[in-house]
């Protein structure tokens, strides 16, 4: 019940975009995915986009190399992937890194595609009031924080 109450208390714009982009388009997108699958057409129901391999942490065991060359995915390539996905009925994206909040054009992606729903996978160390305000204004992004490590996190 508290989940429902929290959902009702959520910013109206965020709630509306969530229902439209995640629930409605998610349902329709999954339906289209099943139709494509029956026809033998392979295209995923949702995509994960790793926008950068740069990170502000050096976690033991992480695939992101702290000594390697920092690379960012070209913004036009990202927009192209998203546009092609929308043509296929897919409006759900996971945004990953490294640490995606390091990616300078991150919010441009969310702004250019208000008809999509994004989950932002972050270590949370760069998340602040400014980021929270931007995400609330955009209303099409849910931040997800990973906490990995031992007791000294």
Locate predicted features.
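Radical SAM/AdoMet-radical enzyme domain recognition
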Residues: 75-95, 103-153
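Rieske [2Fe-2S] iron-sulfur-binding domain
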Residues: 71-73
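N-terminal pre-core extensions flanking Radical SAM catalytic domains
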Residues: 1-69, 86
């Amino acid at each position: 019940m508290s989940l429902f109450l929290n959902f009702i208390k959520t910013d109206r714009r965020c709630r509306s975009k969530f229902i439209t982009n995640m629930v409605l388009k998610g349902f329709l997108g999954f339906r289209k995915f099943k139709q494509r699958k029956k026809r033998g057409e392979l295209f995923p129901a949702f995509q994960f986009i790793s926008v950068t391999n740069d990170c502000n942490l050096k976690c033991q065991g992480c695939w992101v190399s702290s000594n390697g060359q920092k690379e960012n995915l070209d913004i036009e390539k990202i927009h192209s992937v998203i546009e092609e996905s929308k043509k296929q009925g897919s409006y759900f994206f996971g945004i990953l890194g490294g640490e995606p909040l390091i990616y300078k054009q991150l919010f441009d992606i969310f702004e250019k595609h208000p008809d999509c729903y994004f989950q932002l996978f972050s270590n949370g160390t760069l998340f602040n009031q400014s980021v929270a305000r931007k995400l609330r204004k955009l209303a099409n992004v849910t931040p997800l924080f990973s906490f990995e490590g031992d007791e000294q996190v």
